[in-house]
Amino acid sequence: MEIAIIGASGYTGGELMRLLLHHPSADVVAATSRKLDGTPVASVHPHLRGLTDLVFRNAGAGDIDADFAFLAVPHTAAMKVAGTLAERGIRTVDLSADYRLPKDVYEKIYGVTHEAYFEAPYGLPELHRDEIRGASFVANPGCFPTGATLAAAPLAKFAHTIIYDSKTGVSGAGTSPSATTHYPNVGDNFSAYKWTSHRHLAEMKQEAARLGSTARCYFTPHLLPVNRGILTTAHILLREPMGQDEVEALYKKFYADEFFVRYQKPTLAAVRGTNFCDVAVESEGDRVVAVSAIDNLVKGASGQAIQNMNLMCGFAEDTGLRTAGMFP
């Protein structure tokens, strides 16, 4: 199957190429970039040297000749090409935020008018597998909502309040340098940001509601001085107390058939470079602390996008993604 990666020069584009090298049915035939036309992909992603001869092309959606496309472009950019890909019959996973939320919610949260809205399945396979399977266009979830939702999902309908506290690596900010991600400001440091106003909260609320929850949801992210990973602590305040054995049994049953969700003490090192989400819980009566760990670039972005592609195209869900973590 021939694949195009639109916006391939960033971290998620590089991860898509790295992971697709292990996919027996995937052949990446196009990697686009507006600014790097003619530049070898391996010059930007040096870990791929010797593994790909691709060069970046400044190609529009109308010029792409492929069976499948990944949109690895910023929000507002995806909406400008999604319609063209759909019209041409190119199945697509969109890694931007453009199709994750209802139109009115998106426009309120992101402060822009959606120029080409249509409904798309929300690509969290553990919760929406049936909608994703066979779809022609899927909206890949945000990194924070992935870790947060998987941490709280089994208990969401029993909660009256869920407080998400997430710590993320710097790669989540993308490749463009800024004062926030400048090494002297990040190294040997730790800080919260967007304390009450992070856009990903809207996705967390949406998924909690889809799980039958009426819980109030709150979210504060923090920036860690590491490259990869998100560790999320979900404080789940229950309407009725539940004991440790009951909560553990609930989580293990909920994720029993989910290859990519493992019940074990979450650490960033154990999931680095993988599509796994590690989850564990501890009960304090009417408060349960659920912790999850993901790699923000893999299960939080490119790996989950490939997981969605597999479902859309009829491949085994774990094809190309059975990768062990790089530990220690």
UniProtKB/Swiss-Prot annotation:
Molecular function (GO) terms listed? N-acetyl-gamma-glutamyl-phosphate reductase activity; NAD binding; NADP+ binding
Gene3D superfamilies reported for this sequence = Dihydrodipicolinate Reductase, domain 2, NAD(P)-binding Rossmann-like Domain
Q: What is its EC number?
A: 1.2.1.38
**Highest taxon of the source?**
Archaea
Q: Which residues form the active site?
A: C143
The UniProt entry's coiled-coil ranges are none
* Keyword Transferase (UniProt): no
Instruction: List the Pfam families.
Output: Semialdhyde_dh, Semialdhyde_dhC_1
Involved pathway(s):
Amino-acid biosynthesis; L-arginine biosynthesis; N(2)-acetyl-L-ornithine from L-glutamate: step 3/4
Places the protein is found: Cytoplasm
Q: Which InterPro entries match?
A: AGPR_AS, AGPR_type-1, NAD(P)-bd_dom_sf, NAGSA_dehydrogenase, Semialdehyde_DH_NAD-bd
- Share an example GO biological-process annotation for this protein: L-arginine biosynthetic process
Question: Signal peptide location in the record?
Answer: none
Subcellular location, principal: cytoplasm
Regarding protein family, the annotation reads: Belongs to the NAGSA dehydrogenase family. Type 1 subfamily.
Q: What does this protein do?
A: Catalyzes the NADPH-dependent reduction of N-acetyl-5-glutamyl phosphate to yield N-acetyl-L-glutamate 5-semialdehyde.
What name does the UniProt record give this protein? N-acetyl-gamma-glutamyl-phosphate reductase
